[in-house]
From Swiss-Prot:
Stored SUPFAM superfamilies: P-loop containing nucleoside triphosphate hydrolases
PROSITE patterns with a match to the protein in the record: DEAH_ATP_HELICASE (PS00690), HELICASE_ATP_BIND_1 (PS51192), HELICASE_CTER (PS51194)
Domain Helicase C-terminal span(s) in chain numbering: 261-438
Protein name: Probable ATP-dependent RNA helicase DHX35
Superkingdom of the organism of origin: Eukaryota
Higher taxonomy: Eukaryota, Metazoa, Chordata, Craniata, Vertebrata
Keyword RNA-binding: no
């Protein structure tokens, strides 16, 4: 059936009847720090009536029976079935929190842990932080004596294992949204399997909207016989609340999905009935571009006398909360909402009224290239699971339609699921955590999806260069153990621990805290030039790190005033969080007796301290007009958001991360002196024979691969 779209032509496979019924599933986010808001269709009922309306309620006793009789229960439950909020409460009601025991529930994202904890506390009539609490990075809202249901990120669960390796206070651990397969989800999965062998009483629930249940069952099942009666793991499926969704594909590919998204929205508005539109794109820049184009289209349609108007709204993680909330505001019957979103709308929010979904077919993910040692954000095709999840957004409240901006043949060639983070990430933080947990032979660790060997070697080399590992790949004392205690990238941890030696711990604390917060600068589409002009007041020629320091110090000087932030187009909540993060990091520096010192306005000690942690992320300006990495001569460019963009390019820079769009762009960039690299990382860099050249000297890093096996020696020196 041809879809009502002009230049973009769709067709729906199959019959003229209802399309594919899509059940939503949750997918890992690249931009996931936004506010979670969940639409509740039963809000008018009492709390108890709402609980009983959820599909999982009918299976309450069966779930408790399975948990009593199996070490591991894999629960596949569609979005909205109630598994995240209800199962922990069923466990508490059945006695699993008696005698001081705790039910722990992990979430892959901080915002989900906080939101679900708040909902469960509300349902139980409890004060959040007492019986029900949450623990996320830099924010522990629990009571050691009173908390019985604890929501936490998977990363925080792994950190708890550093103090209590067998998780002795927990009776049940529930891994929610396990299919997202984040780095720390996979670490937790491997560690929990080891713990279960020591603790037969520990119960594990692996829950998700959609996952490869058989793979999880095979991984956790400790039955070594052919007798199914001796299985230790079982699968349970819970139904949900979804409506049929008709799927439409393109008849032929289009070269520009941004333009096609705009055309599709306009045609739906002109030819389809009531219902709001949700369009998926890959990032903030694309979202803002499409929003601007659609606003122009809406004005043009209004001039033609069209009675129904379009209200176009952006939705992405870095959008201020008050802007995000606009997508939930009711509109009159003469207005149709169009929400243009990143994949934050796949999982972190649920919006009522969506009937039409437009899927561009791409997503922005973090990927690590072990050959270049660069981790960056890249735009890649979505998985089939993610595409189905997007389509399901149109079937929440009634039957819907999904327009995919790609062919059915292209859909069939998409991967079934997204590659786990473990296989596409920088593994230095992972290895550091495993080493701190006593896992000496990380290459023999039971990963559910083993990471590439080259990525492991690259991570070991970096940790060795930072001084966190010795030549035998053991954690160094005290530096390695201290780096492992920081809930940060090892480079940030090293920078913080060295800050006292450089006499600038006060400044480095502020910089490190600010670098943990995304989108500090707010640029409203209708005030772009004004916002950029105001932001330039904070900029310094040294680069982004000191610019962020200026922003933070100005925020503190103005008593953390929200009005001041609004006037200066700054993310108030982000800055408040940066202040909280700074206090947490400060406690660690006090613990490790790092001297409290300030550089008193001198930038050099601060810059040198940054280099002491980020020396591996160095690049030099090339005659071609681009930058080249010192390590592998990879071409990089300064990101347009950097204060150094469009300025006279510094000869040498260091950066925090790289993102890939049309080019590889460095973000959070600061100018440095090449001599600092030789001075602060002589083990990593050596002076070349020609002027202004450096060698990358890789130390001898030995990796024990097998118990009785061999040693792989890395001893390379590359002249650039």
């Amino acid at each position: 059936m041809a879809a009502p779209v002009g230049l973009v032509k769709f067709w729906r496979p199959g019959t003229e009847g209802p399309g594919v019924s899509i059940s939503e599933e949750r997918q890992s986010l690249a931009e996931n720090s936004g506010t979670t808001v969940v639409y509740n269709p039963y809000a008018a009922l009492s709390i108890e009536q709402q609980r009983q309306k959820l599909p999982v309620f009918k299976l309450r006793n069966h779930i408790l029976y399975l948990i009593e009789n199996y070490q591991t229960v894999v629960i596949v439950g569609e979005t909205g079935c109630g598994k995240s909020t209800q199962i922990p409460q069923y466990l508490a009601e059945a006695g699993w929190t008696a005698e001081g025991r705790v039910v722990g529930v992990t979430q892959p994202r901080r915002v989900a842990a906080v939101t679900v904890a708040g909902r469960v506390a509300e349902e139980r009539g409890a004060v959040l932080g007492h019986e029900v609490g949450y623990c996320i990075r830099f924010d522990d809202c629990t009571d050691q004596l009173a908390t019985r249901i604890k929501f936490l990120t998977d990363g925080m669960l792994v950190r708890e294992m550093m103090v209590d390796p067998l998780l002795t206070k927990y009776s049940v651990i529930m891994l929610d949204e396990a299919h997202e397969r984040t780095l720390y989800t996979d670490i937790a999965i491997g560690l929990l399997k080891k713990i279960q062998k020591k603790r037969g009483d520990l119960r594990l629930i692996v829950a998700s909207a959609t996952l490869d249940a058989d793979k999880f069952r095979d991984f956790f099942n400790q039955n070594e016989t052919s007798d199914p009666a001796r299985d230790t793991c079982v699968i349970l499926t819970v139904g949900g609340r979804t409506f049929p969704v008709d799927i439409f594909y393109l008849q032929s590919p289009v070269p520009d999905y941004i333009k096609s998204t705009v055309e599709t929205v306009v045609k739906i508005h002109q030819t389809e009935g009531d219902g709001d539109i949700l369009a998926f794109l890959t990032g903030q820049e694309e979202v803002e571009t499409v929003v601007s184009m659609l606003i122009e289209q809406a004005r043009a349609l209004a001039r033609t006398g069209m009675k129904r108007h379009l209200r176009v709204l952006p939705m992405y993680a870095g959008l201020p909360s008050f802007e995000q909330m606009k997508v939930f505001e009711r509109v009159s019957r003469s207005v149709r909402k169009v929400i243009v979103a990143t994949n934050v709308a796949e999982t972190s929010i649920t919006i009522s009224g969506i009937v039409y979904v437009i899927d561009c077919g791409f997503v922005k993910l973090r990927a690590y290239n072990p050959r270049t040692a660069i981790e960056c954000l890249v735009v890649v095709p979505v998985s089939q699971a993610s595409a189905n999840q997007r389509a399901g957004r149109g079937g929440r409240s009634r039957s819907g339609k999904c327009y995919r901006l790609y062919t059915e043949e292209a859909f069939d060639k998409l991967p079934q699921s997204t590659v786990p983070e473990m296989q596409r990430s920088n593994l230095a933080p992972v290895i550091l955590q495993l080493k701190a947990l006593g896992i000496d032979n990380v290459l023999r660790f039971h990963f559910m999806s083993p990471p590439p060997a080259q990525s492991m070697v690259q991570a070991l080399e970096l940790l060795y260069a930072l001084g966190g590992l010795d030549k035998d790949c053991r954690l160094t004392e005290p530096l390695g153990m201290r780096i492992a205690e920081f809930p940060l990238n090892p480079m940030f941890a090293k920078m913080l621990l060295e800050s006292g030696n450089f006499g600038c711990s006060q400044e480095i604390l502020s910089i490190a805290a600010m670098m943990q917060i995304q989108n500090i600068f707010v640029v409203p589409p209708n005030q772009k030039s004004q916002a950029i002009r105001v932001h330039r007041k904070f900029a310094v020629e040294e680069g982004d790190h000191l610019t962020m320091l200026n922003v933070y110090e100005a925020f503190i000087k103005h008593n953390k005033n929200s009005q001041w932030c609004q006037e200066h187009f700054l993310n108030y909540k982000g800055l408040v969080r940066a202040a909280t993060v700074r206090e947490q990091l400060k406690k660690l520096l006090v613990k490790f007796q790092v001297p409290k010192k300030s550089s008193e306005g001198d930038p050099d000690p601060v810059l040198r301290c940054i280099v002491s942690g980020f020396f591996a992320n160095a690049a030099r300006f090339h005659s071609t007009g681009a930058y080249r990495t010192i390590r592998d001569d990879h071409e990089l460019h300064i990101h347009p958001a950097s204060v150094l963009y469009a300025e006279k390019p510094p000869r040498w820079v260091i950066y925090n991360e790289v993102i890939q769009t049309s080019k590889y762009y460095m973000r959070d960039v600061t100018a440095i002196e090449s001599a600092w690299l030789l001075e602060l990382a002589p083990h990593f860099y050596q002076q070349g024979t020609q002027a202004c050249t450096l060698h990358v000297g890789r130390g001898r890093v030995f990796i024990s691969i097998l118990e009785h096996g061999y040693l792989a020696c890395r001893d390379a020196c590359t002249c650039l």
